[in-house]
């Protein structure tokens, strides 16, 4: 009985506890990321933004949560009720489950698997099904058009993200997310005789791929200027037109969790994960998880500024950018990186 408890029950309870802690912390973080997004956008437009609920409006996201939860969900009479209600749940659950392999510090991951980056890539690819299910089940032309756009857009930019992952794999020699972070500790700067700093991280050595990943992440998560899936001027709200109350909240939650996930991936692949920007005191005194969160916030700030300053692309411009610009550049970078590592022996 003791053996059964130690080998089966206790590990399962630990995983459950880690999952609950992760979900609670993630949801609170997403609430404040949403608050920051609204504040940044307001500052650019010379507005105040949320400033009523709580000190300086810091509890606005929680007030919105209560508002959505206590509203009555309205289901269109012609909708497929089962798929209509399942779609937002699929979107939210898939977005959260991708975080199982994200290391926010050394050894801080629910599952430290050797193919972690492929797991995240697969989960992010599946998220489009929630959008397609919601658009089809609504039995309305605007949600359906939004769902079709989503399918084409996500498939187009996943190709570029895939080549970015291949490039990072070549430099790190591993698909394990923790190994990818640790490989940036002694990067190109250190090998050239420079001090161990943020110049060792992949953002410098793979700068074109960093830019491609950043822009592709915007398209993958339907963020401006690539928010054509839910373009207000054309499709009202895209696949979420017919949704209200908790189902709408789940779609909204899944969208922002996916955005923060892409910020975390950019941090892990290009910004050194939990590594400090300078490998000496007092920077090494700061816990790695603090550096990780600060880097995620830095990437998200860039995403928010793009939303505030860049106008929305036309759909043909979006597809042309993905297939005629990013695909050739990313493919060339894969070949160039492989050739460089082979010739110089840096791998």
UniProtKB/Swiss-Prot annotation:
GO terms for cellular component: plasma membrane. One of its GO terms (biological process) is aerobic respiration. Signal peptide: none annotated. Pfam families: NADHdh. It is found in: Cell inner membrane. Its main location: membrane. The chain crosses the membrane at residues 13-33, 82-102, 115-135, 161-181, 198-218, 248-268, 283-303, 321-341. It catalyses: a quinone + NADH + 5 H(+)(in) = a quinol + NAD(+) + 4 H(+)(out). Keywords: Cell inner membrane, Cell membrane, Membrane, NAD, Quinone, Translocase, Transmembrane, Transmembrane helix, Ubiquinone. InterPro entries: NADH_UbQ_OxRdtase_su1/FPO, NADH_UbQ_OxRdtase_su1_CS. It is a multi-pass membrane protein. Its EC number is 7.1.1.-. One of its GO terms (molecular function) is oxidoreductase activity, acting on NAD(P)H, quinone or similar compound as acceptor. It comes from the Bacteria. NDH-1 is composed of 14 different subunits. Subunits NuoA, H, J, K, L, M, N constitute the membrane sector of the complex. Belongs to the complex I subunit 1 family. NDH-1 shuttles electrons from NADH, via FMN and iron-sulfur (Fe-S) centers, to quinones in the respiratory chain. The immediate electron acceptor for the enzyme in this species is believed to be ubiquinone. Couples the redox reaction to proton translocation (for every two electrons transferred, four hydrogen ions are translocated across the cytoplasmic membrane), and thus conserves the redox energy in a proton gradient. This subunit may bind ubiquinone. This is NADH-quinone oxidoreductase subunit H. The gene is nuoH.
